[in-house]
Amino acid sequence: MFKIFNTKFMRSAPIVAAIWISLTAGIIIEFNRFFPDLLFHPMS
């Protein structure tokens, strides 16, 4: 089962970038769900 992660396809740049962007978006979405007003501060 872990042999699929040793292939060149899973370590290529588009796959790593898609996983990284999805993980970052998920972290931001969950942070915004639990703390809805801390992400964007008003300028006033």
UniProtKB/Swiss-Prot annotation:
Belongs to the PsaJ family. The keyword Thylakoid applies. Gene3D superfamilies: Single helix bin. NCBIfam families: PRK02733.1 (NF002743). It is a single-pass membrane protein. Its main location: membrane. GO terms for biological process: photosynthesis. It holds the Pfam family PSI_PsaJ. This is Photosystem I reaction center subunit IX. The chain crosses the membrane at residues 9-29.
